[in-house]
Amino acid sequence: MTVPQLLEHRIDTLFEQLPLVGRLGQAFQEAGHELHLVGGSVRDALMGTLGHDLDFTTDATPDQTEAVLRTLTHATWDIGRAFGTIGARIDDWVVEVTTFRTDAYQPDSRKPVIAYGETLEEDLVRRDFTVNAMALNAATREFHDPHAGLADIVAGKLRTPFPPERSFSDDPLRMMRAARFTSQLGFTVTDEVRAAMTDMAGRISIISAERVRDELSRTLLTDHPRAGLDLLVTTGIADHVLPELPALRLERDEHHRH
C-alpha cells in the first residue's frame, strides 16, 4: 500500500469508526465555522492508535464553540477560556476544542502571550513537532500537512516546524516531550533536533519542577522508557532534571571497565 493509499484508508477508517468527528464537523459547518481534528489526535489516527481524547481547532470563538457543542451535549466545561479551549463529553469521548491561536514568547519565560489566530496555518506552525502539526477537516475530510508531518511519521522522525533552536527557546519543555515521544512512538530525533537539545539543555531550568516532573513521569510510563531517558542523558538535559541518571550510567560504565 502506498503512502497516499494508506492515508486515505486511515482517514476513511477514522470517520467510519468514529462518526462523532463527522457530526461535530457538520455542526460547526452549519454554524458557519471550520473545525479540524488536530495534533496528537491526527497523528494517532494515522498510526492506527486513536485514544479516547479528541483535540480540535476552530475559527470559532470560545463562546461560539460552546454554543455549537451545546447542540450536541449538555456536558460542556471551561478548560481554559483565556487559552481559547472548551471541553465536552459526547458519548464516551472527551472533546477539547480550541480557537486558532498564535503564541508569542518572552525570552525569560515559558508562558506564552496568547492571541487568537485567523488561519489554520498560523495555528499549526506553533506546535511542538511536525507529527503533531497536521489537521483534518472534520466536515470535508481535507487533510492539511504544511510541514510534512506524514512523511516524518513514515520515517519515524521527530522534527520541529520552526528551526529547533527557536522552538525550544520558546518552550523548553518541548525538549522533554522529544524524549517522551522517542519512548512512546519509537521515533528518533533528527540530528538538528538533537544538536539543539544539547546546546540548549540548560534552558530547561526555566520550567517549573512540577511540569518537568509530569513530563518525566509520562516518559517513564511508556512501554520503552529507556530510549527517552538515553536521549535526556546524551543531550545533557538529565544533568539538569535528573542528575542521578547520568551518575548511574557513569557508575555502570566504570563497573564494566574494571
Which residues does each PLM region occupy?
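Catalytic cores of the polymerase beta-like nucleotidyltransferase superfamily
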Residues: 1-258
